[in-house]
Amino acid sequence: MARRGLLISFFAIFSVLLQSSTSLISSSSVFVNPSKVKQVSSKPRAFVYEGFLTELECDHMVSLAKASLKRSAVADNDSGESKFSEVRTSSGTFISKGKDPIVSGIEDKISTWTFLPKENGEDIQVLRYEHGQKYDAHFDYFHDKVNIVRGGHRMATILMYLSNVTKGGETVFPDAEIPSRRVLSENKEDLSDCAKRGIAVKPRKGDALLFFNLHPDAIPDPLSLHGGCPVIEGEKWSATKWIHVDSFDRIVTPSGNCTDMNESCERWAVLGECTKNPEYMVGTTELPGYCRRSCKAC
């Protein structure tokens, strides 16, 4: 299975990288140092890369975004359309992948760290949170049948912190499972009340938080529920990269056609995957699968 195989392969590779404290992974001129990565949660899977972005990269992204900030919106769970909501009170803008060499370099760095294709990612969204602004707990995978058509679910999310925040502004996972023998990496006194409601990551300029919205079998992970705590003192700048299961750049074909969306569908169907993994292969009326033709579902 392409989707399931991609996820499982990634986690296998990533676990090896986390065990290495000295090796560097490179792609062309892009280097990733596993020793700077620490796991902050296992359920959901979440990791922080300390110093992922340089000071220059952070300041450059903020500079690009300042001129085109607009109030942030959320996706309606039924229609999939964007709407304004008090759930999300930040302002933001999208930076195209090939905007300039610095942005392209960040895109390369993300792909090298995650082992995920650049074409699966959306453009980077830069956000500004001023005093009192926040993003209530939400999921990054989709509940509507519109957004999922292009690239499938958002498999992974990377939050890159572009500024330090004096107080507040943490990213919190309120439903994350907290190990009974957890060693606290943060002094609870340094966290806001919002952040104390679960496992939280304090925004530090240059750091990046990577977490997965799906389980390795491509099923949505409800423990990936997360939110951005209100900024109490200072200002918060961040950049979000959503990475989908499949290509986000690929042109979506018109609906109504009985086609397979993966060249391996016919082989998988012969191997019995239509019944073993019906969510991916067949799907539902609202969220059609990727191999409906080979599974004789249309």
Swiss-Prot record:
Cofactor(s) demanded: Fe(2+); L-ascorbate
Endpoints of the signal sequence: none
Residues holding 2-oxoglutarate: K236
Membrane topology (UniProt): Single-pass type II membrane protein
Species of the source: Arabidopsis thaliana (Mouse-ear cress)
Domain ShKT per the UniProt entry, residue ranges: 258-298
Compartments, record wording: Endoplasmic reticulum membrane
UniProt domain Fe2OG dioxygenase: residue ranges: 120-245
Family affiliation: Belongs to the P4HA family.
Residues that, per the record, bind Fe cation: H138, D140, H226
Name of the protein in its database record: Probable prolyl 4-hydroxylase 4
InterPro entries attached to this UniProt entry: Oxoglu/Fe-dep_dioxygenase_dom (IPR005123), P4HA-like (IPR045054), Pro_4_hyd_alph (IPR006620), Pro_4_hyd_alph_FE2OG_OXY (IPR044862), ShKT_dom (IPR003582)
